[in-house]
Amino acid sequence: MPQRGHPTQTGRAAPGSGWAGPGEGADTIRGMILSDGSIRRLLEDGRLIIDPIEDVQIQPASVDVRLGPEFLVFRNHVTEVIDPYDKPADLNERVQVAEGTAFILHPGEFVLGTTVESIGLPDDLVARVEGKSSLGRLGLLIHATAGFVDPGWPRGQITLELSNVATLPIKLWPGMRIGQLSFHTLDAPAERPYGHVDLNSKYVGQSGPMASQYARNPK
């Protein structure tokens, strides 16, 4: 195992004093979770975009994100079944929560929400969407499967997949800290980052909660 501060077999420095941080030259360590200091440096350099953000949101190895006031709910009374390849236009209904009021998420219910913050990632960085421990202990899950934000993600909000697995309703307050993002470096910049012309990137620049676009996939 390489010692701290000594070159590895790839020619990059191992973690230790003098580490430049992501995207800063030959000493960059790839494949690591970013610390608070590295997150701040990327924000200052403009390579990582989180807007708006306050310094208190930056945790030791993540950034807290807040819940926006918009939700997408399923219109169960008009839809009998969901076909991912043939999504009806009236499957979802948009709900805007007034300032000072909460959205009530009932047991077993699933809705789409959004972050307050818009996120932008460089081509050599991915983000993971994670819940908050204190909310998880209340039975709130913030994503079903979509916990991965691709490298090159253009500036846009993150859609949250909110579900209540508890036995009591949960109040969701706009502006509350709903989750956190951790950031991971790639071993090399992505050759075809999100939004590349050769990819079927369906959520470029999303604003507010965005319903499933699975029907746009080829069968």
Residue ranges and their predicted role:
Residues 16:
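Acidic/negatively charged segments and metal-coordination signatures
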Residues 27-219:
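DUTPase catalytic domain/fold
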